[in-house]
């Protein structure tokens, strides 16, 4: 019988996940289909019960359901609970188990462009929202020891740092202070929506004094190169946009559901093509 997978969210019509996963199923000769389901917030509980009753094998969760879905699941992975959000659900032995592949997906994406282990790196995170939280805890989970957090509201950065459980040295900074200190970091990660289309002229941090070999990663992929990435490239940095994170988190979910490893490069090229790159 054909296996059913999907993604729930609102809006959902723009999602690239069905194209990416269905191509992977076809490429691996798997009898499976991935579908996008529009789910209103007030109907989330009913939708989850319905998907479970239909025997869905697994599904992704996107805006605005990543936090609210947690109360409807049978089990939540410890890292997802720490992050406070779920983006991947596995249906196993009649139980719905929630995971968060956003942060781990980002870490894998970052490792793919880093010539050295991340563990010894000094990292600056820009922003303290849901994406930043997922990345912060996932970096800590793989043993990164120095992660500073810069935010427009410093208290929000302090809140994120205060929630840590791993042995991580972290300082909360203003964006102004981060601008001054940018040369002290090996990796800078931009996790906010600042610079996203159509506000492409905006940036949370002016890049002006990076040290040689710095990696600057932005989780935005529209545009492909945000202002912060353009400035970093001019400074000679290694840059990475959000396509890698999107692909790696999707590939990780695929592995969790199926036990199979999809072709990452094929996934990435398909997403770039669909985005008009």
Curated annotation (Swiss-Prot):
GO terms for biological process: amino acid biosynthetic process; aromatic amino acid family biosynthetic process; chorismate biosynthetic process; shikimate metabolic process. Belongs to the shikimate dehydrogenase family. It catalyses: shikimate + NADP(+) = 3-dehydroshikimate + NADPH + H(+). One of its GO terms (molecular function) is NADP binding. The keyword Oxidoreductase applies. The gene is aroE. The active site is at 66 (proton acceptor). CDD domains: NAD_bind_Shikimate_DH. Homodimer. It holds the Pfam family Shikimate_dh_N. It comes from the Bacteria. Pathway: Metabolic intermediate biosynthesis; chorismate biosynthesis; chorismate from D-erythrose 4-phosphate and phosphoenolpyruvate: step 4/7. The keyword Oxidoreductase applies. NADP(+) binds at residues 127-131, 151-156, 219, 242. GO terms for cellular component: cytosol. Involved in the biosynthesis of the chorismate, which leads to the biosynthesis of aromatic amino acids. Catalyzes the reversible NADPH linked reduction of 3-dehydroshikimate (DHSA) to yield shikimate (SA). It comes from Bacillus cereus (strain ATCC 14579 / DSM 31 / CCUG 7414 / JCM 2152 / NBRC 15305 / NCIMB 9373 / NCTC 2599 / NRRL B-3711). InterPro entries: Aminoacid_DH-like_N_sf (IPR046346), NAD(P)-bd_dom_sf (IPR036291), SDH_C (IPR041121), Shikimate_DH (IPR011342), Shikimate_DH-bd_N (IPR013708), Shikimate_DH_fam (IPR022893), Shikm_DH/Glu-tRNA_Rdtase (IPR006151). Shikimate binds at residues 15-17, 62, 87, 102, 221. Keywords: Amino-acid biosynthesis, Aromatic amino acid biosynthesis, NADP, Oxidoreductase. Its EC number is 1.1.1.25. This is Shikimate dehydrogenase (NADP(+)).
């Amino acid at each position: 019988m054909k296996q059913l997978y999907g993604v729930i969210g609102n809006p959902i019509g723009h999602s690239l996940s069905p194209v990416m996963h269905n191509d992977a199923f076809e490429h691996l000769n798997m009898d499976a289909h991935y579908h996008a389901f529009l789910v209103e917030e007030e109907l989330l509980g009913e939708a989850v019960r319905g998907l479970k009753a239909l025997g869905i094998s697994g599904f992704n969760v996107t805006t605005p359901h990543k936090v609210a879905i947690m109360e409807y699941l049978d089990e939540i992975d410890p890292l997802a609970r720490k992050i406070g959000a779920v983006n991947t659900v596995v249906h196993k032995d009649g139980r719905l188990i929630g995971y968060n592949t956003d942060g781990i997906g980002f870490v894998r994406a970052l490792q793919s462009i880093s010539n050295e282990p991340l563990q010894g790196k000094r990292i600056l995170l820009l922003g303290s929202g849901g994406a930043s939280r997922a990345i912060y805890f996932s970096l800590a989970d793989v043993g990164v020891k120095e992660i500073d957090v810069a935010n427009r509201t410093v208290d929000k950065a302090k809140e994120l740092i205060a929630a840590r459980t791993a042995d991580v040295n972290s300082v909360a900074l203003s964006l102004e202070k981060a601008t001054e200190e940018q040369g002290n970091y090996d990796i800078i990660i931009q996790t906010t929506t600042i610079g996203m289309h159509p506000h492409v002229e905006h940036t949370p941090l002016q890049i002006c004094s990076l040290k040689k070999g710095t990696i600057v990663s932005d989780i935005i992929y529209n545009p492909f190169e945000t202002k912060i990435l353009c400035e970093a490239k001019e400074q000679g940095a290694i840059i990475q946009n959000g396509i890698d994170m999107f692909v790696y988190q999707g590939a990780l979910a695929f592995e969790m559901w199926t036990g199979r490893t999809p072709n990452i490069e094929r996934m990435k090229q398909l997403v770039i093509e669909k985005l008009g790159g």
